[in-house]
């Protein structure tokens, strides 16, 4: 099967490596230099102290000559991708973004494509234009959005590497909100406080603030089992206690964060429902202020 991976970041390179073991994969990049490097060198993956390599094609333009397109760019980069996707023929498109900001866009995006959404539970760090470090084994989980047919992707994903499992979930909202609640509790606080994930559990004041954020987000998302969700947030914090969240890494690196995708979605939903979200509003404003002052690390 022919699969196009849109985005040459950590998730894009990770997906491209593993999917290329079973499919004809092309990475669609923004920069010609990266496309040329992937075309000539392939993709290198580092895992458990070993290096692996896979051949892969690359290009800088999107076309409809694919059985599946996997969109891995960050949410704030999606608008240019949407406009490109509107110009190609009908195909299957899987969106793998942090947060849920793109959901509002997808609901208003009236195209003939079959749309799917998913989450990435792997840890990955891009080392170069052609290399990715697989830092944590997890899974890709996906679901059909609106009236898309799940069988189309189930056929595509029937063969996968054991270190890169791909699972179908029946309820896209439950799938995405399950990860969103974790990201909303951990990412903004660690970025604001400049701490590793584990400190949110070991510092009482941080834990108390995280619980307030959790309760506010739960009310907005109307989560069914808050106790189980809170246990999940704490478990992820503990399992990744030595990690710096992606939002903290972006703040330190002077890059735009995914605050709009994570907190922005919750604030928009709160507004639509007429709910107060004072803690999330504070976090959102604080992170956006940090983005404007990227030369300052507190």
UniProtKB/Swiss-Prot annotation:
The lineage of its organism: Bacteria, Bacillati, Bacillota, Bacilli, Bacillales. The active site is at 179 (proton donor). NCBIfam families: apbA_panE, PRK06522.2-4. PANTHER family: 2-DEHYDROPANTOATE 2-REDUCTASE (PTHR43765:SF2), 2-DEHYDROPANTOATE 2-REDUCTASE-RELATED (PTHR43765). It comes from Bacillus subtilis (strain 168). Catalyzes the NADPH-dependent reduction of ketopantoate into pantoic acid. The keyword Ribonucleoprotein does not apply. It comes from the Bacteria. Its EC number is 1.1.1.169. Substrate binds at residues 98, 183, 187, 197, 246. It is an enzyme of class 1 (oxidoreductase). Coiled coil: none annotated. One of its GO terms (molecular function) is 2-dehydropantoate 2-reductase activity. It holds the Pfam family ApbA. NADP(+) binds at residues 7-12, 98, 124, 258. Pathway: Cofactor biosynthesis; (R)-pantothenate biosynthesis; (R)-pantoate from 3-methyl-2-oxobutanoate: step 2/2. Belongs to the ketopantoate reductase family. GO terms for biological process: pantothenate biosynthetic process. GO terms for cellular component: cytoplasm. Keywords: Cytoplasm, NADP, Oxidoreductase, Pantothenate biosynthesis. It catalyses: (R)-pantoate + NADP(+) = 2-dehydropantoate + NADPH + H(+). This is 2-dehydropantoate 2-reductase. It is found in: Cytoplasm.
């Amino acid at each position: 099967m022919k699969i196009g991976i849109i985005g040459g970041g950590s998730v894009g390179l990770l997906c491209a490596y593993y999917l290329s073991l079973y499919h004809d994969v092309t990475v669609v990049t923004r920069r010609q230099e990266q496309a040329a490097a992937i075309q000539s060198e392939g993709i290198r993956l580092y895992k458990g102290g070993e290096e692996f390599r896979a051949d892969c094609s690359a290009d800088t333009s999107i076309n409809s000559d694919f059985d599946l397109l996997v969109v891995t760019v960050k949410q704030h980069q999606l608008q240019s991708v949407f406009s490109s996707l509107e110009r190609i023929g009908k195909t299957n498109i899987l969106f793998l973004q942090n947060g849920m900001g793109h959901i509002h866009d997808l609901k208003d995006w009236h195209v003939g494509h079959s749309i799917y959404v998913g989450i990435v539970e792997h840890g990955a760090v891009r080392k170069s234009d052609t290399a990715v470090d697989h830092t944590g084994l997890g899974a890709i989980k996906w679901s059909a959005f609106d009236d898309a047919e799940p069988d189309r992707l189930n056929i595509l994903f029937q063969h996968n590497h054991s270190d890169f499992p791909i699972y179908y979930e029946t309820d896209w909202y439950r799938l995405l909100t399950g990860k969103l609640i974790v990201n909303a509790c951990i990412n903004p606080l660690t970025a604001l406080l400049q701490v590793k994930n584990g400190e949110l559990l070991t510092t009482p004041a941080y834990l108390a603030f995280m619980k307030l954020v959790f309760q506010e987000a739960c009310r907005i998302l109307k989560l069914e089992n808050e106790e189980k969700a809170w246990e999940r947030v704490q478990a992820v914090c503990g399992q990744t206690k030595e990690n710096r969240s992606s939002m903290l890494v972006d703040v330190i690196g002077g890059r735009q964060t995914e605050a709009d995708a994570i907190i922005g979605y919750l604030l928009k939903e709160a507004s639509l429902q007429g709910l107060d979200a004072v803690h999330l509003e504070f976090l959102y404003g604080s992170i956006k202020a940090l983005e404007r002052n990227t030369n300052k690390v507190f």
